Amino acid sequence: MTAPTTRKDLMIVNMGPQHPSMHGVLRLIVTLDGEDVVDCEPILGYLHRGMEKIAENRTIIQYLPYVTRWDYLATMFTEAITINGPEQLGNIQVPKRASYIRVIMLELSRIASHLLWLGPFMADIGAQTPFFYIFRERELIYDLFEAATGMRMMHNYFRIGGVAADLPYGWIDKCLDFCDYFLTGVAEYQKLITRNPIFLERVEGVGIIGRDEALNWGLSGPMLRASGIEWDLRKVDHYESYDEFDWQVQWQREGDSLARYLVRIGEMTESIKIIQQALEGIPGGPYENLEMRRFDRLKDPEWNDFEYRFISKKPSPTFELSKQELYVRVEAPKGELGIFLIGDQSVFPWRWKIRPPGFINLQILPQLVKRMKLADIMTILGSIDIIMGEVDR
């Protein structure tokens, strides 16, 4: 005869870091009472590579290939933030054509990131078909990237004062064709997913974040806009040429997983609008600020006993970062991606602080999953949209 228990037997379960629903090396220590979640503790750091410290020992040009390894599904945004800081410190003007090319690349990258969020998110909650559909469109975007930059991922395309190369012949027509095709693809997603009763049952009312709660946690991006706050840095900060295009900020009031899905689906359509306007109105002229070619040719920088010959045979062009502090930010697919940069009259940054949107958005996860079912963890985590390379840096 077994003795009666006076307390509930709680079970502690490790989810990850090898679990397919963790989208990388995230580990969750989940305390369960049957199938109800009592507590959840995220364990981070499995993909930490010291990206901030590496930046302090590299010039901006040398550091550009590293930044594409933060959020490796939206690399154009990490490149943009890396060169925007030095451009503002040095008061460097970007030609209008280069600015339009940047906007086109950023919005294509936003669509690719949202597509690769949508497929695994649907697979996590049991819908396998969209996972294969999104790769069809994503491959077309990567073909465009490959034609313009030479790389399908990790493009290393942005430069201080412009971009690395002009758009090749025929690229604009090819991109316009993609825009027309993709709008029909989004309509297909809407028909397949948005009105699906099983999908709605899994996401509606799950992981609700209130307006004040979203502000207090410092959320940004679709996480913030799905909670009733119409905040988009492309409208707020007026960077690049976004003010010259006609588009709307996508937002919802409900704050649940369905609202976050609707915001991202809407953003893909708005990105296509921006790309079409930029392609049709792209001006002529140079694709880079030719003055930046000169950089610091007159004097050799002091390397502070840094063995530069082991990095490269020829010195890379660089310039001094003036002695001031600067915070720059862009609206990345996952939220506000920011850099706090401190220069000290050296070719190396004195401090390079990364503000990753995924890391800050992830902090609210334990609060959202408490008192929910175990299966809802996948839905809520998927709706947050994290990439562990960016979270752990």
From Swiss-Prot:
Keyword Zinc-finger among record annotations: no
Topological type in the membrane: Peripheral membrane protein
A matching Pfam family: Complex1_49kDa
Keyword hit for Thylakoid: yes
GO biological process, one term: photosynthesis, light reaction
Molecular-function annotations in GO: NAD binding; oxidoreductase activity, acting on NAD(P)H, quinone or similar compound as acceptor; quinone binding
Reactions catalysed: a plastoquinone + NADH + (n+1) H(+)(in) = a plastoquinol + NAD(+) + n H(+)(out); a plastoquinone + NADPH + (n+1) H(+)(in) = a plastoquinol + NADP(+) + n H(+)(out)
Transmembrane spans: none
Primary location group: plastid
Cellular localization per UniProt: Plastid, Chloroplast thylakoid membrane
SUPFAM superfamilies associated with the record: HydB/Nqo4-like
Entry keywords, A to Z: Chloroplast, Membrane, NAD, NADP, Plastid, Plastoquinone, Quinone, Thylakoid, Translocase, Transport
Gene Ontology cellular component list: chloroplast thylakoid membrane
EC number: 7.1.1.-
Family: Belongs to the complex I 49 kDa subunit family.
Subunit details: NDH is composed of at least 16 different subunits, 5 of which are encoded in the nucleus.
NCBIfam families referenced in this protein's UniProt entry, alphabetically: PRK06075.1, PRK07415.1
Function: NDH shuttles electrons from NAD(P)H:plastoquinone, via FMN and iron-sulfur (Fe-S) centers, to quinones in the photosynthetic chain and possibly in a chloroplast respiratory chain. The immediate electron acceptor for the enzyme in this species is believed to be plastoquinone. Couples the redox reaction to proton translocation, and thus conserves the redox energy in a proton gradient.
PANTHER family referenced in this protein's UniProt entry, alphabetically: NADH DEHYDROGENASE [UBIQUINONE] IRON-SULFUR PROTEIN 2, MITOCHONDRIAL, NADH-UBIQUINONE OXIDOREDUCTASE 49 KDA SUBUNIT
Family annotation (HAMAP family): NDH1_NuoD (MF_01358)
Name of protein: NAD(P)H-quinone oxidoreductase subunit H, chloroplastic
Gene expressing this chain: ndhH
